[in-house]
Amino acid sequence: MSTVKLDITKEHCPMTFVKTKIALSKLQKGDILEVLLVEGEPLQNVPKSSREQGYKVLEVSHVEGQVHKVLIEK
Amino acid sequence: MGITELNILTEPKDPKKLSIISFSGDFDKLVATFTLATGAAAVGYEVNIFFTFWGLDAIKQKQGRSFVGTGSLPKLFGFFMGGLRSAPVSRLNFCGISPKIFRYLMRKKNVATLEELVEAAKALEVNMYACEMAMHILGLQKSDFIHEVRDVLGVATFLDISEGGRTLFI
């Protein structure tokens, strides 16, 4: 199992979702994707859509300012 | 026809399927098409795009102006219509300057460009189809399109494919 980091704090719709989805598709089952994202649409919907697609959201935590960290297990 | 005229043609039964009829070859409407397509695919939707008429320009292998097509009139049309890189904006095109300005602004503001959205659609395995009738008029072959175009369809097959989801006409 490995952890891959993805920073989408500077991305805008739809690339926030697109980059998360593509990163997840490259992982092996059991690997973890650590996503840095900002409040608003990315924070509301990246964890939600990941859960809906069958991935396990392990943690959503505040980092600093508007930046949050989401851990997603494939 | 403006983006405000995007029409929802059907009520969804299966909310996880989005089908888009890409009729316009305009830059701004193609951005709308590929933004919706990639966003939907990324959050788990099955996405189908049916390219017809001017929309076929978006999926040509040759992205600039070239004499694509069989026959002199289709070749001439093919040249003036061009491909993805030649797409005009639907308003204030200013002889093709505006798409260049939009591309500059999109890069500067870190928003995905049209070309990046198309690449994302390929990576997310969005299903792309070409309209058989429009291809026939314009003298285009499947080999004139990017490899990711899955098939050449007529209306009946597209209706089968899109059944049960949302359908948009752009």
Protein language model annotation of sequence segments:
Chain B
Residues 47-53, 129-131:
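Short internal beta-strands
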Residues 2-29, 35-38:
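N-terminal glycine-/serine-/threonine-rich phosphate-binding loop
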Residues 56-68:
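N-terminal beta-loop-helix "entrance" segment that forms/cooperates
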Residues 67-103, 110:
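A glycine-rich helix N-cap at a beta->alpha junction
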Residues 94-156, 160:
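A charged, amphipathic interaction segment
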Residues 160-170:
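Gly/Ser-rich helix-loop-strand patches that form or flank binding pockets
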Residues 20-30, 59-60, 105-109:
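Short, glycine-rich nucleotide/cofactor-binding loops
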Residues 31-44, 49:
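Histidine-anchored nucleotide/phosphate-binding helix
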